[in-house]
């Protein structure tokens, strides 16, 4: 049995299946884990979700994913709280025969996946530097509970698009909308933050070097990586294609290599401890 952790798919079905073939994937033995953003902008979101949901139905213990910002955007569009953009290529999903299955799949998908035996944690954007893995799990469990409640789901999706609060405060209550919003932002939108651990959204078009001139740094420069090392955990994340999967922090692995932007799809072979990034790019004509 092998464990493979995939970077953002974004509906790049052909590259995904080509990479599965490249690693000699055996659905009866191997485990697949995804860093989120299974859909959004890519050419074949229906095929991508059909394959993943079918595999999960057959092998529920071997297929795992976390929610990404594009996955949550799809839920918000479905419920009428956000307008679909043509570039996101969601219309084919919204008109698909299995639409309700996709909605239930994403509503049951957590923000964080942790395997204590394999000593791994997977989150779309990462884990807020102030939190340990146990604390992060507690916070994400709150959102999983929210998404199981029809009314709370609508409240969250209707109000999640805001840049505040931009930092965590211990007095935030589990029933507080600001608390919900911060959890979602930290796990699905986070890239940069200040030394005071204030999340930054104003440097999204800057390089890391440019942001550092304004004393803004990658989230993984702070705090919790040392906690992961102490616990012998490794954290895997996607979301940040501009990094090209370059992260120099021990016990933190970046996996988004920008397949949907014309680059390649990557995965990490856990048992071999190696990143697999063959240049498989399917050209559509």
Language model: regions and residue ranges:
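Acidic, His/Gly-rich catalytic cores of divalent-metal-dependent hydrolytic chemistry
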Residues: 137-285
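Short amphipathic alpha-helical segments
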Residues: 17-20, 46-47, 77-79, 134-135, ...
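Short hydrophobic/aromatic-enriched beta-strand-loop microsegments
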Residues: 28-29, 83-88, 255-257
């Amino acid at each position: 049995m092998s464990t493979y952790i995939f970077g953002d798919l974004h509906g790049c079905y052909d590259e995904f299946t080509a990479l599965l073939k490249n690693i000699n994937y055996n659905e009866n033995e191997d485990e697949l884990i995804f860093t989120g953003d299974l859909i959004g902008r890519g050419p074949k979101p229906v095929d991508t979700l059909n394959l993943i949901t079918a595999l999960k139905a057959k092998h529920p213990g071997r297929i795992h994913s976390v929610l990404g910002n594009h996955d949550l955007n799809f839920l918000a569009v479905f419920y009428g709280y956000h307008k679909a953009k043509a570039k996101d290529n969601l219309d084919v999903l919204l008109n698909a025969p299995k639409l309700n299955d996709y909605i239930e799949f994403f509503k049951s998908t957590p923000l964080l996946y942790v395997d204590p035996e394999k000593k791994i944690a997977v989150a779309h954007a990462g884990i807020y530097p102030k939190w340990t893995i146990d604390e992060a799990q507690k916070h994400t469990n709150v959102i999983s509970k929210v998404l199981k409640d029809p009314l709370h789901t609508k409240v969250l999706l209707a109000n999640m698009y805001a840049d505040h609060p931009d930092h965590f405060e211990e007095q935030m209550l589990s029933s507080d909308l600001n608390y919900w919003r911060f959890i979602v932002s930290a796990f699905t939108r986070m890239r940069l933050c200040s030394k005071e651990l204030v999340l930054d959204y104003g440097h999204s078009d800057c390089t890391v070097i440019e942001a550092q001139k304004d004393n803004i740094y990658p989230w993984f420069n702070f705090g919790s990586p040392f906690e992961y090392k102490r616990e012998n955990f490794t954290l895997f994340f996607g979301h940040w294609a501009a990094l090209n999967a370059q992260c120099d922090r021990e016990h933190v692995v970046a996996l988004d290599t920008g397949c949907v932007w014309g680059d390649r799809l990557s995965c990490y072979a856990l048992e071999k401890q190696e990143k697999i990034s063959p240049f498989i790019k399917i050209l559509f004509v």
